[in-house]
Amino acid sequence: MKIFQWSILLVSFSFVSLSFAQKKEINATVYAQWKKNENQQISSNGRYISYEINPLFGDGFVYLYDTETAILDSFPRGKQAGFSFQSDYFVYKIVPGYDTLRTCELRKIDKKKWPKDSLGIIVLSTKNLQKLSDIKSFELGKEHNFLSYFKNSDELYKAIPVKKKWWKKSKKPVKAIQSDGTALTILEPISNFSKAWLHVTNCELSKNGTYATVTTHQKTKKDSYQLDVFAFAQQKTYQITQQQTAIPSVVFSDNQRHLAYLSSQDTSALKKYDLTLITLDSLTAKAANASKKIVLSDSLKTISMHQNPVFTLNGNLLYFGINDKQPILEKDTLLESEKAHLDIWHYKDLRIQPQQLVQLKQDEKRSELMVYYLHKDLIVPLSNDTLNVAIVKDLHADYLLGSVSYPYEIEYQWESAHRKDHYMVSLKDGSTKLLAKGVAFDGKLSPKGKHYTYFDSKSKKYIHLDPLTMNEMCLTCAQPSINWQSDINGMPMDADPFGIIGYSRNEDSVYIQSEKDVWIYSFVSQQLVCLTEELGARNQQEIALRLWENDSVFIDRSNVYFYGFDQLTKGFHLYDFDDKQGLKKLYSANSSFVQLLRSPNKKTLLFRQSTLEAYPEVMFTTNNFLSLQTISKTNPQQAGYNWATVELVKWKSYDGIPLEGLFYKPENYDATKKYPLILYYYELNSDNLFSHSAPKPTASIIHPTEYASAGYLVFIPDIRYTAKGPAKSAYNSIMSGVDYLLKTVPSVDSTRMGLQGQSWGGYQTAQLITMTNRFKAAMAGAPVSNMTSAYGGIRWGAGINRQFQYERTQSRIGKTLWEAPEKYIENSPLFNVPKIQTPL
């Protein structure tokens, strides 16, 4: 009997050992197995949650979870899912199979003949599923229960073929209407309401679904567009305009009293546009004054099609744009290749020529902002060719904030903080009032126009200005030890402030973010108080205010929660706030915070967190984190693979700076063995201790899980940059970390160490192998080898030069090439190539 028991025990141990030993290695062949959890949604009533799980290649699923019944449904090839406004039906797009589309592409089949998307509609009370074919796009209402969808084809129903008779009957064929539009349907599945149109190019529904606009198109000798309004209550269609050559924009006011649209009857390429205002009540009453064309007083200006009309939230004002009228060029007989094109360059240009060329189309579309008073029939100009004014929909005052950049634009070539002059712009008459000159970071004008606050980069303090009296005062001078600026890790530039969060509803206070806490300045008591009671500073947490909904221009404390990143553990804390009790901890974990959504009825929270080992699955709570339920399982196959473990290591650089780094080991790590070591680096990474690293293709960087799975140790040290320059700073940080590991981890094989970096990390790799020969091999992706030549290079995507990068930002030289040529040479790997012995 004992022999039998020992046999069972030995067999059990054998199975355990075999199971662990048989864990597979992660490599490029398994990328397709790993999936992503995407597009998480929560219904308005908080009962339903949906998400997608999609592989790198292949067909995914959309999932629907009922939090009351705990039933999880899945639907193959589902994408872009959403819930109706009233949470009574669920919609998702059904895409064709991956293999089907791949076959079509391989066989070079015309894309018009490829299988099309479908639409799945589920009535949640009955779980009945309806499928609609040939879907181009769909849209759900945010504050109404309608669903609108376009088909790819311009037909509602396919004609049923009629059986042919033996005799022929001559009949004049009906000429098919040619159109750029397709079939549109507006549907309400619960009430079974459905309305369809043909030849539709655009559809807009009003905020709560009282009206819908339908723009239709027919091709005749010229394009012919027609705009109609459908009133759901009357079940009637009202024609707004027809025989237009373009209707590029249609917009409802939020109060659903008015409609504005742009249109043109010109047949030329340079069209002149009209802006027309429709009073919807008058339209449905068939009143003669339902339509009003907005006329400009300046005959040299025209309505811009590049600035969509925007109503203010109260519906009293309408923003729109104007342009200079463009001359119509006379036709000629020259070929395009025979025409001369002239570019004029000047050394005093505010933008260099490559940047001008990149931004040419943007400049051509630039509009001057105007505002129209609906009840006064008054147009007020707000901006011009130098003054930029930001549109505010939720207006609470007669002022907007404007900015002028042209006095400083030429210095943008070498400065990273872009200075601007800030103005208060009157909505009543367009007059401007200078608030502050040379503001390097965004200032904030309060919604009611009582306060203007900005961060002064010279004094490193927040300054308040009373726009009425122009009196200034310092808001943060009472707290000189508080850090209001972000960590820029040695870049020779002005650091960004953490920012002005916003103003209270009655504008008696302003919320300001510091490095570790949230502060509130009272304009009544003229005192700066820490709203978070300096909990962040005491506990080494970076506590930040976050909004549940971005639906107000004010800070409402019932709409906030607080997130705290723990600088010591790299975990996080979530807090609620009570005016009497202050911060109240909701949840904390040694993991990485990924996502938090709240249902509109505030009953359900959707939550995601991760660690290196644990994928950020979809979780939910209905009791403020007293309990959490996990509902997704994205990558169960991970259990069969040799994964990685990670630990936070701490040491000091050669020049005494405290440093941190991430040290990864294989899951099956054996401390008695020797392992090769791979180093990867890019600025600061230790805060990513709990980030999940899933296998996937990369752009020339390494994934530590993949290398650890293959039997490597991976070290990702933080690099702290000092005035010694990027080369010496990187050397002191990286090599001191290597020495620390060799001293404390005997399993590191010092004869088999490698370097890997991409972009700025690639530069560090190229530079490091000119300074040491301790590494067996190195890989430098997209490095800069010669800073002297790169200094005047062009970033072709933006058209800007790289000068600022070396003088102010990541390259951290801090001087021009002529002021310190020795620094550019010292920090350029090219000039020390003869010293390199490491295979690269």
Predicted segments — roles?
Residues 685-687, 714:
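Serine-hydrolase catalytic-loop signature spanning alpha/beta hydrolases and amidase-signature enzymes
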Residues 673-684:
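Short beta-strand element of the alpha/beta-hydrolase
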Residues 369, 618, 651, 661, ...:
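Conserved hydrophobic/aromatic pocket- or pore-lining residues that grip, position, or stack substrates
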Residues 445-447, 454-455, 567, 608-612, ...:
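C-terminal substrate/ligand-recognition segments
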Residues 694-840:
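Active-site-proximal cap/loop segments of hydrolase catalytic domains
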Residues 20-616, 620-621:
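Beta-propeller folds
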Residues 632-673:
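N-terminal cap/lid segment of alpha/beta-hydrolase-fold proteins
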